[in-house]
Amino acid sequence: MKNYVIQRRYAKALLLIGKEDNNAEQYKEELNGFVSVLDMEKAFESAITNPLYPVEARRKVLDMVIEKLGVSVMMRSFLALLFEKRRIQHVRGINEVYQNLVDELKGIVRADVVSAGELSDDVVEKIRASLSKMTGKQVIVDIAQDPTLIGGIVTKVGDMVLDGSIKTQLSNMKESLKKGERV
């Protein structure tokens, strides 16, 4: 929980600056680009977060990568601040929170849909339209498959989970039968 509080605090601060100078979307792309480099180059992440390396050496590595990425002065300052405050290891979480905040600002919500099998484009579009109607926002749907669901889908939008999987229905029936209830 503590990490989320830290991540949200920095993400909200960056969003305030982004709203103020109308560069929130640019910062979203730059921060996401930096996190992509971390994901691709594990040695880079270790070089900037490992306390066994001297601070100045870590700073030089960070500065070189930031320079190569060609990010804005604001993003350069933001990443330097994270480094100075020893929060650079939270940059992935900050990025995730920031992406969601910018999407929220633009009236976009992300939905994770997990199905037992592959969904046709028509079905995905119907799910998207229905979620959009329900939330009143534009919905971006991320699809995943999980054969253990047996059938149906599980949809997660923010904190709300809609579980229409056969696996859950069977589990609920099993519990009802154990309790001696009618199904």
From Swiss-Prot:
Localisation: Cell inner membrane
Chief location category: membrane
A molecular-function term among this protein's GO annotations: proton-transporting ATP synthase activity, rotational mechanism
GO CC terms, sorted: plasma membrane; proton-transporting ATP synthase complex
Keyword Lipoprotein in record: no
Entry function: F(1)F(0) ATP synthase produces ATP from ADP in the presence of a proton or sodium gradient. F-type ATPases consist of two structural domains, F(1) containing the extramembraneous catalytic core and F(0) containing the membrane proton channel, linked together by a central stalk and a peripheral stalk. During catalysis, ATP synthesis in the catalytic domain of F(1) is coupled via a rotary mechanism of the central stalk subunits to proton translocation.
PANTHER family named in the record: ATP SYNTHASE DELTA CHAIN (PTHR11910)
Name recorded for this polypeptide: ATP synthase subunit delta
Species of the source: Desulfosudis oleivorans (strain DSM 6200 / JCM 39069 / Hxd3)
